[in-house]
């Protein structure tokens, strides 16, 4: 089975799709030299969706992220592709998941955290699916030794709790060996 990973970045979601048995194809505007599977440089909003059994989309989150709130309040605008992505995916008929940050206007979403799955990853994300998912998920297990993973380093408002920025390697281990 083939999965399409839109806005793939370095491949964090791709690794999970691979572990679930999919042949993964990632699409991103930016070069991703470390993407672990088949990579296509292109516009996720224009990429053909035919021929895939499952589609994962992680559109840019800056329009909703807590880490950009001060900049947004100061007037900075970020691209918001969430609604157009949802429209495209609904129209194509292929099962899909859209992933984004807490604060994004997701529909019927589920909140997942790395600690729910035995990882040291403190990272809450929202998941909107085209299919029902089990609501019998384990609760978050925040014990105090989790590593927060954000887009580009640990935000200053979060560093007080963790005392430092964690290395890419430490974040990779916390995420179960994948980067994204």
Show where each model-derived region lies.
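SAM cofactor-binding core of SAM-dependent methyltransferases
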Residues: 3-48, 56
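Class I S-adenosyl-L-methionine
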Residues: 6, 28, 41-54, 61-180
């Amino acid at each position: 089975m083939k999965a399409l990973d839109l806005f793939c970045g370095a491949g964090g979601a791709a690794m999970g799709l691979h572990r679930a048995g999919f042949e993964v194809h990632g699409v991103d505007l930016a070069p991703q030299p470390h993407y672990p599977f088949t990579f296509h440089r292109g516009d996720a909003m224009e990429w053909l969706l035919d021929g895939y059994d499952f589609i994962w989309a992680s559109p840019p989150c800056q329009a909703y992220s807590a880490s950009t709130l001060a900049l947004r309040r100061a007037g900075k605008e970020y691209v918001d592709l969430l609604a157009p992505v949802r429209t495209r995916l609904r129209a194509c008929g292929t099962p899909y998941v859209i992933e984004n940050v807490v604060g994004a206007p997701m529909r019927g979403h589920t909140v997942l955290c790395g600690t729910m799955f035995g990882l040291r990853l403190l990272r809450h994300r929202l998941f909107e699916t085209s299919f029902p998912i089990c609501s019998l998920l384990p609760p978050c297990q925040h014990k105090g030794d989790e590593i927060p993973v954000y887009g580009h380093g640990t935000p200053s408002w979060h560093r007080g709790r963790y005392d430092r920025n964690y290395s890419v390697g430490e974040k990779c281990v916390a995420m179960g060996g994948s980067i994204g």
